[in-house]
Structure formats: C-alpha cells, structure tokens
C-alpha cells in the first residue's frame, strides 16, 4: 500500500510493506544504533544500490537525542567526504528518525533523507511529516527544523523483533490519533488485541493516512497539526523531570493522555465514562496511565517550555468527545493545578 503526502515540491510517498530494492544516485550514509543495526542493517544493505555506503552508529536512547550526537553525525559525514548529493537513511525508531532528519536539514544547508522506521511509534507517527530535532536541558524537541523525507518505508517485518514494551508505546500514539480524529478507529482498539499481522497493518495504514492528511493541511504546525500533540504537553514534562529514563516516549504520552482527559473532564468536555473508556483501552495494551507528580506548581511552570506555548499562554490539546478535539489557550491556572494535584 502507498500513501501520498501531497506537499507540492516536498511531496513523497509512504510505502507500507512494499520495500524490495532501493536504488539511489550518489552516496548513502545510514544512521542507526547498535541494537537496530544488529537486526536490520544487513537486510537494508543487501537491498540498497548506490555508489558508496557509510554506516554511522549512534548510542541508543532518548537521552542521546541531543546536539552532541548531531555533532558526531556531522563530523562523520564530513570525514567521509559526503556532499550535497549524499542521501541519509534513518534506520531505527523515532529518535533515529528525528536526529537523521535534523542532520540532513543542516548538513551543507540541506540534503535528502529517507526513513526506514523500525518501531511502531515511528511507523504510525514520527517518521511521517518532516518534524526533526533534538532535546536540550530546557525541554524536548526545542531545537529542530521542518525537513520532509524523500520517502518512508514501513515494513511490518521490522515489528517482529520489537520488544512488547516498545510495541505498546507505539500503540499509545495510534490511540492518540483515534481519540482526536476517528471514533470508529478508537472502537477498533477497544475490540482488537493487535495479535494478528492484519490488524497491525490496518492500524499502521490508518495512522499514516490520518497523519498525512493533517500534514498536508498544516505542514509547519500553525494550526490543526498541533492536535497531534494531544497528551504531549503533559508527557514532555514527565519525560523531562524523569530525565528521559523512566518511561518510553509512548508511555509518557499514555500518561499525558489520561492527564489531559482529566482536565477535559474537569472542564466539562469529556464524560466520566469517556475518560474511563480511554484509560481502560490504554491499560489493555499494558500502558501506564498515572504518574505521581512531585509538585503540581513546579510541574505547571514547566509547561511554559513547551513549543506550543505562545505569548505566555499554554496551549492544551483536549478531547471534546472521542473522535473530536478542542484546542484551548485560556484555561485558568487554578483549574490546571487542581487537575495536577489529583496526580500528586
């Protein structure tokens, strides 16, 4: 299956279970980590035709998604005499995709890159849409750029080697899209165990279609694309205060979704039954839904480091009902604090 991301001169296709062989003019640098490289690098190299192939291996983990690692990638590209005709390939999950895209956007003012997402989270979300970047001490993804890939190859085979915890983390991002945009898709998660390859393929296809549609409408996140950050305003603070070590990104998003839903309940948007249904669906896929906040006031202040915060107004993405979103920039501080205190 193919999904077209129609962005005029930046258009590209997402290929789902269609990869056989890839021919690229010029040199190729594959960016991966030791774990993924050990599993899938040989498979990619065997089916890749180009001039020269370079392998750049970076440490595995969100804590390495920073400018230091980008500097290492750039140094290896320069020392290998790569140029503007070089194509980067991201072979890995969301961290690899984000860093490869960012490196491609700034190396000699921009070169091509292709995504081979090997995690469910990357296939349903991170690899599509051109958001690239790294974290710093002030927060997550605060340094980055919009740089669209030339193609994305989502192979179900990659998911066969994914640890169960990583798989569940990807499901959280998929449920996020269902709650925001598609009630029937949410019912799919209520009724599915995601044990069959057909169900998994259906989930990936639906998510890619939703993501592509949103990106086409709002490539640079000036409007509706911000809705894809549902759960993330809370999740990014959780990741930061736990130093990116306690939760996988999708797990933090799952907790963030539940926190956002409790805020929506307090504001009268969601019913108790809807909050319960979403929470139980997340739990069904072994995802966490709660986190003990050390201090509600300090947690609240960290919202201001979120990229969506503008003019000192925190932008909250909430569910108005399952399948319908609401963007709020004027929620009183005391209402948010009261919600956070429920998690203290």
From Swiss-Prot:
Pathway: Metabolic intermediate biosynthesis; chorismate biosynthesis; chorismate from D-erythrose 4-phosphate and phosphoenolpyruvate: step 2/7. Its cofactor is Co(2+); Zn(2+); NAD(+). CDD domains: DHQS (cd08195). One of its GO terms (molecular function) is nucleotide binding. NAD(+) binds at residues 60-65, 94-98, 118-119, 131, 140, 158-161. It catalyses: 7-phospho-2-dehydro-3-deoxy-D-arabino-heptonate = 3-dehydroquinate + phosphate. InterPro entries: Dehydroquinate_synthase, DHQ_synth_AroB, DHQ_synth_fam, DHQS/DOIS_N, DHQS_C. The keyword Secreted does not apply. Binds 1 divalent metal cation per subunit. Can use either Co(2+) or Zn(2+). NCBIfam families: aroB. This is 3-dehydroquinate synthase. The gene is aroB.
């Amino acid at each position: 299956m193919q999904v077209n991301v129609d962005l005029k001169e930046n258009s590209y296709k997402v290929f789902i279970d269609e990869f056989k062989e890839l021919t690229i003019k010029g040199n190729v640098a594959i960016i991966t980590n030791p774990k993924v490289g050990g599993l899938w690098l040989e498979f990619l190299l065997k089916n890749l035709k180009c001039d020269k192939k370079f392998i750049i291996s970076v440490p595995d983990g969100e804590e390495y998604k920073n400018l230091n690692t980008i500097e290492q990638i750039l140094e290896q590209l320069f020392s290998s005499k790569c140029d503007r005709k070089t194509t980067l390939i991201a072979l890995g999950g969301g961290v690899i995709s984000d860093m490869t895209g960012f490196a491609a956007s700034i190396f000699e003012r921009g070169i091509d890159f292709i995504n081979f997402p090997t995690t469910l989270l990357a296939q349903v979300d991170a690899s599509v849409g051109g958001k690239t970047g790294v974290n710093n001490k002030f927060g997550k993804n605060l340094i980055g750029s919009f740089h669209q890939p030339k193609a994305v190859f989502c192979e179900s085979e990659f998911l066969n080697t994914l640890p169960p915890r990583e798989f569940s983390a990807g499901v959280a991002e998929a449920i996020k899209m269902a709650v925001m945009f598609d009630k029937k898709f949410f019912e799919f998660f209520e009724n599915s165990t995601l044990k069959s390859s057909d169900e998994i393929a259906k989930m990936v296809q639906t998510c890619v279609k939703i993501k592509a549609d949103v990106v086409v409408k709002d490539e640079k996140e000036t409007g509706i694309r911000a809705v894809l950050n549902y759960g993330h305003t809370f999740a990014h603070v959780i990741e930061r205060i736990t130093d990116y070590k306690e939760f996988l990104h999708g797990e933090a998003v799952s907790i963030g979704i539940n926190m956002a839903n409790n805020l929506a309940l307090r504001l009268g948007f969601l019913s108790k039954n809807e909050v319960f249904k979403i929470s139980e669906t997340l739990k069904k896929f072994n995802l966490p839904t709660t986190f003990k906040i050390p201090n509600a006031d300090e947690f609240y202040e960290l919202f201001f480091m979120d990229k969506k915060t503008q003019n000192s107004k925190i932008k909250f993405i909430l569910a108005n009902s399952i399948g319908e979103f609401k963007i709020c920039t004027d929620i009183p501080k005391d209402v948010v604090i009261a919600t956070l205190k429920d998690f203290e």
